[in-house]
């Protein structure tokens, strides 16, 4: 009804922005006439204009005014440097991002190029722009590729990668535009708030952030806290014993039936029954699992969770004797990440690998609260509309759908649902075989490593050649190579969740990528230092045979850089091979044999494959030969492109509905990019997880009613509705969990902001002395309030204890006696002690500074930071325990969240009091050595 009256809100928004696009287009001819130097001069003119702003509001207004000209400038620079011109819909996307909204753009519509527009415009302010991607590879690719446009226009471009030194991080964060990943950004923030001097702080205050694959980070990752932890000692034998006990405990199959524990798959939790408690206590030979001196409950719960809820090759893989988490959304391994609260150790005990030390949280924040620290936030994704409510409620981000540049020609075929899982997989293999014979490229999405290997075995039996892309290390190495060829005629690719895989699937094959791969093959062995080959490892494959990971020699840990020969559509002509060898020789003459790091050499190839102006002779030669190779490959790929289009384009097959419709849409979006033809179909079974957990009894009843063979597809409106309903239920369920996480974390967030602001003030050394004096005065006030009740007559005041308490904190006040204060009022006592403590502090300062001038300031900084860090760490644990126990309050008709807020606030106030008192006590007790020394 409202839509009919007012029109679609998305269309209204787009119409509003259309005038800016028109204005940008009108400037195109004028900007085209400018020389390279004149284009660069425009950047200085814009900066001068922005300097006139006296506050943030005026700055935003000027940015809005110069937007059309700045966008026209970026469009022209991009055309000159990369050979890529922004379409009108990409300009529209850029406007949406600059306005601090989310731009939903379909796969293949050039999201990466869109980000150059708001990044340049906001980068002009000099306050820093962060472009955030999901992994190091994409951050590096975009910094090298899109960064050329910014560098050409005179802005500095930084890149943050894991393993980088603090000095390099600081330098890269100081750039106008910095490319990084969400985890590096979050961990740097936490580390900065654990720094002991300003020299260790690497980030500047946050300004503007553009998140690529925004839904993946703000929604899928929202429940994942970033944690920096330190080791704590817990006996590893307890994990092993608990794992053995868990094996002997039996799962309860029906509600209130026999069994030792019940499993709540929805909440991913387990509950011991009364029998379970008794049995576990009996097997352990203890009276109580919750005994404070010898607690076992924590270990037993985790061991059962490890047994029932965490499956090998689905939730994790075992690699090199370590349990490595697999990200359920991207299908990638999360190297270096561990489950907390002893869960990882329980899984290590289950898999019989070495149990690593448990850790204690030192600093933590969720992505939800981290990204809310930015004054202006925006993001891009192919799929955000389904989560619009959450993005708007939690992050205050509107979603705008950007139309595609060409109309979509993708056909989404109806789901094929099978009664049993076996029937489903047979049908998938048959459809692959049928389409493969016609020569259509096929992409099959699976939800786990285990399922992808099951299908791979079926296809092997049918002798269908295929590529496998999942979290196993031997496959990860070839990721871009596999995706780049997934659109070739007859190609079959099996991939675990396609989220965040940054290479486009181009019908007929990606000639640009093939050409770069060929140059890499010749150039890298001659140019790269051998010790750079950190990735060169051999990994045992399935079946005990040792497979050779792509690009590695079979017996030595040395990279060969050779891609598999079937990647290339044709052999190169002799003339081109000769030119390639000459270009490599020039590179070696210029840089020396095996002299460059891997990243430097990769960067040379990346720049050579673009059109950025360069004086580097090596890049010029590589560019000439790149164009020759590409021209030869393109003869074949363009012919193949037309053949594949004739056949109907890429066919995408889903093999299970994901918990989120968005992830399904991401998979579908791989077909029919940029107006190409394509089709998609989902193959499902009534035994799939989603239907088992959320489909409920309706589906079970339907199964019994349908007397069909397991290999016959069922098509039923009720079933499709059940599926849609199940997915919506899951989405709502997880949204509620995320909302709850957010509400609880909001309490921690306010405390975190307060403690980090206090810490930063101390680091910057602002009025440290005054701060400590205020701490001391407040402590004196608290002592007076504890021993003097103004409502009672003075003879009942406990002045002796009061005075001895004062001396306990400040030994320099030994001369103060009860008689000094007995005739004073409550307020007079406070004022008297304020004066005394200030005098005592002056004496202390002179005493300390005699050892080394300025030592007192260092001591103040050291003691305040030490107390903040130690007590904040304990507070984090206290809040975690409070949160675990607070859920039980719900049974007592109290709102757990309100209780948590109240008690959490009281705990925080107590911590602040302890920090204050401990600092005062430590500083007055501090006795530096006789010679100069640093604290």
Swiss-Prot record:
What EC numbers are recorded for this enzyme? 7.4.2.8
Q: Where in the cell is it found?
A: Cell inner membrane; Cellular thylakoid membrane; Cytoplasm
Instruction: List the record's Gene Ontology CC terms alphabetically.
Output: cell envelope Sec protein transport complex; cytosol; plasma membrane-derived thylakoid membrane
Which EC class is the enzyme in? translocase
Q: Which Pfam families match?
A: P-loop_SecA, SecA_DEAD, SecA_PP_bind, SecA_SW
| Primary residence | membrane
Biological process terms in GO annotation: intracellular protein transmembrane transport; protein import; protein targeting; protein transport by the Sec complex
Kindly give the membrane topology term recorded for this protein: Peripheral membrane protein
UniProt keywords, alphabetically? ATP-binding, Cell inner membrane, Cell membrane, Cytoplasm, Membrane, Nucleotide-binding, Protein transport, Thylakoid, Translocase, Translocation, Transport
Q: Residues that bind ATP, according to the entry? A: 90, 108-112, 504
Q: Which GO terms describe its molecular function?
A: ATP binding; protein-exporting ATPase activity
Its UniProt entry gives the catalysed reaction(s) as:
ATP + H2O + cellular proteinSide 1 = ADP + phosphate + cellular proteinSide 2
How is the subunit organization of this protein annotated in UniProt? Monomer and homodimer. Part of the essential Sec protein translocation apparatus which comprises SecA, SecYEG and auxiliary proteins SecDF. Other proteins may also be involved.
User: What is the protein's known function?
Assistant: Part of the Sec protein translocase complex. Interacts with the SecYEG preprotein conducting channel. Has a central role in coupling the hydrolysis of ATP to the transfer of proteins into and across the cell membrane, serving as an ATP-driven molecular motor driving the stepwise translocation of polypeptide chains across the membrane.
In Swiss-Prot or TrEMBL terms, this protein is called: Protein translocase subunit SecA
Recorded source organism is Gloeothece citriformis (strain PCC 7424)
